[in-house]
Amino acid sequence: MLIYFGAAVKYEGRGMEQLSEFERRLMIAQGKKIERTQFTELSETKVITAREYYVPGDTTEATAFAVLATVGNMPKDNVIKLLNVDLNSSRAGALTCLKRMGANVETVSRREKNGDVFGDVEIKQIASGKRLQGRRFSEDVIATALEEYPLLAVAACYGEGETILRVPKEVRKEMRPKNEFLAVNLRKTGAEVGVYDDGLVIRGLETIVNGSDFDGGDSAQIGLALSVLSLALQNDEPVENMDKVEAMFPGVVDKLKNVLVAENAEKKE
């Protein structure tokens, strides 16, 4: 980062820098500690150049808005516009999955800055009489949507037919207990949820009228997904153990509530 602003920095590192983005995410998901050593030499720099550095909006939050706008009782003709969403190929898999299921999700602009790809995404209601369709998603696709996995599972509960969400081999052992915990919550809706070593198999319902007493446990991602489900079901009871959700996604639940009431809602990332 300092080099980007003109500082004379020499850096040598070993550890995380030798890992790909996918490998880093897998190790984090596995709970492994990534050790690294580094050597930094900073020479005198007389002038630091002011430059703009932009960080795209979070993909997980964007996916939460997309799922709720798709399955929730959003006012007719509302358009949800998500600004500056991270569209890097290693992170945008969940939005692609939703589109394949039939969600009305469109990338209306795409930009690149500092090596990151980001853009604006619009979500509209599915056409009247239609619903999400069950799909099979391979390990390679899910590898780009690991943090959004619980949100895709919620969407699958509304899908027609069977949805298969295959987990990459490297994280199956670590994700199995999380998937079992998630499945306990999703089954409260009446959806059929099978938990297997290689992921979840979900047979959705045309209409979900039941479902409450959801518990986010110790996972911010599961808590966020269940919050989306609870809002879609218009539950009065809050999801339990939401502290981790608020810590990782501050204020997101209040913003999500606006999806169901605001017209032409626009969210800036």
Which role does the model predict for each range below?
Residues 1-269:
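Short, structured segments at the rim of ligand-binding sites
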